[in-house]
Amino acid sequence: MQKKLTSAYVHIPFCTQICYYCDFSKVFIKNQPVDSYLEHLLEEFRSYDIQKLRTLYIGGGTPTALSAPQLEVLLDGLTKNLDLSVLEELTIEANPGDLDADKIAVLKQSPVNRVSLGVQTFDDKMLKKIGRSHLEKDIYENIDRLKLAGFDNISIDLIYALPGQTMAQVKDNVAKAISLDIPHMSLYSLILENHTVFMNRMRRGKLPLPKEELEAEMFEYIIAELERAGFEHYEISNFSKPGFESRHNLMYWDNSEYYGIGAGASGYVNGVRYKNHGPIRHYLNAVEAGNARITEEHLSQREQMEEEMFLGLRKKSGVSMARFEEKFGRSFDGLYGEIIRDLVQQGLMQIDGDRVRMTKRGLFLGDTVAERFILE
């Protein structure tokens, strides 16, 4: 039975290369049962009887590692039973190295209306250093092709504080990103994750990362430059021109529920956060057995309130106290008043009418501030 959920995340775990910083659920595409995977994924999607979605996000891995015919099967299968009149945003992630003319033609024929390109950096030497196979020229070619095909809602991902990266290189990246004339970008500082090439190098003392002060300077520079170029810094890592915020990601930060479909995907349905089987074979067998999930966590009200704060405070607009009280039936001031007043005094938060939100300094310290909202 379709509850009021209006968002879904679909995971395509295949990649044409494995990047040195990535710990997402993914496998090298060669010799993988891709067609069988798509069949099983669509079977899982159909099991939820999804008809009305506001946002649909296809991520990975690399969805564009699929061939053009496979992409067509996926997009057709996901959208044929949807009421497209309510679908506001359908995003697909793409790799500048493998988005050819045939694949763009498939996207154009489908309801996809937003493309997110994993650029990471414009520096060819750095791209090689982080395990990416595309080149700077591929980025420009892809963006030109997408614009020519009529896509105006294009986003790119960039990473800063990369090994050996200088402030001059960050400035160069930001200037090149702005010159693309696109309405959205996400900029993430490099985070070292377990089971990645970079983490192994760091443990061996072979990864020269920028110092924390330089990373903070990079972050400040990025914000100032993008705001000067007409972008709004609407979430810790995200910048958009007016009206081009990622609606799907805003759904996450509003702590709304969503379906997670595919190997290793996470979802949040009826107060339950779940994760699907990750290894492809395990996932295929699980779908055949009628349940793709490997873990389920029933969130208590306390956990739901904590998540509401952690996620909501990532947004520039912060958290609405009235919405919080309406959602949970608890006094916001009774739970968090003292903590908020303390953080306001430290210059990390501000109260703006009905909303509490982070200051610029608070945003940079993101997680440290968020930890204060853990309820004992």
Label the predicted regions.
Residues G329-V344:
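Short amphipathic alpha-helical interaction segments
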Residues R355-T359:
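Minor-groove-contacting beta-hairpin "wing" of winged helix-turn-helix DNA-binding domains
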Residues K3-L5, K26-Y48, K52-R330:
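C-terminal scaffold of the Radical SAM
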Residues P13-K26:
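Local cysteine-cluster metal-coordination motifs and their immediate loop/turn environment
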Residues V10:
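Conserved N-terminal Rossmann-fold NAD(P)-binding element of oxidoreductases
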Residues R361-E376:
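Short, amphipathic alpha-helical interaction segments positioned at domain boundaries
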Residues V344-D354:
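A short, conserved structural fragment
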